[in-house]
Amino acid sequence: MAVLVLASCGGDKKETANGVENQNTTEHSAVAPADVIMMTVKAMNDAAANLENAATADELIDATADLYSEMKRLQANYGEVMLAVDTLSEEQMNELYPEEMKAMEEAAINYSVAMMGKADLMENLTPEQEERFMKIIEAEL
């Protein structure tokens, strides 16, 4: 695997086969970037399945909240690795993680299709449901 050195306020980061290591501290993540990408893919695929199974607007909102909650959990646990991955260009990502990026693209499409398939539920939100949904979305912005 190619070695990539990244600069950030936390110090220089070096991508290794075992994860991203902060060169200025003893912090080290034992999780490889490819693993974090696949955890994100799993979260998106789970959310797409939950959306597809949603029969009510509340279930749709819950599925969205679950995805955002899982993404926050991943960020809290693997933020340093995610930050390093986020600094890569799309070309670098595709070069370093071709299978993972293909899975990510498919997961994003599946999630979008699942959400579009529930447009009827989104169009009929009550004011309370709309407010709840917007709070979930705004918390992520």
What do these predicted regions represent?
Residues 5-8:
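C-terminal motif of bacterial Sec signal peptides marking the signal peptidase cleavage site
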Residues 13-69, 136-141:
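Immediate post-signal-peptide N-terminus of mature secreted/exported proteins
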Residues 30-50, 94-141:
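C-terminal amphipathic alpha-helix
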Residues 11-12, 20, 80, 118:
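Intrinsically disordered, low-complexity regions
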Residues 48, 71-82, 108, 112:
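A structural signal for well-ordered alpha-helices, especially hydrophobic packing surfaces
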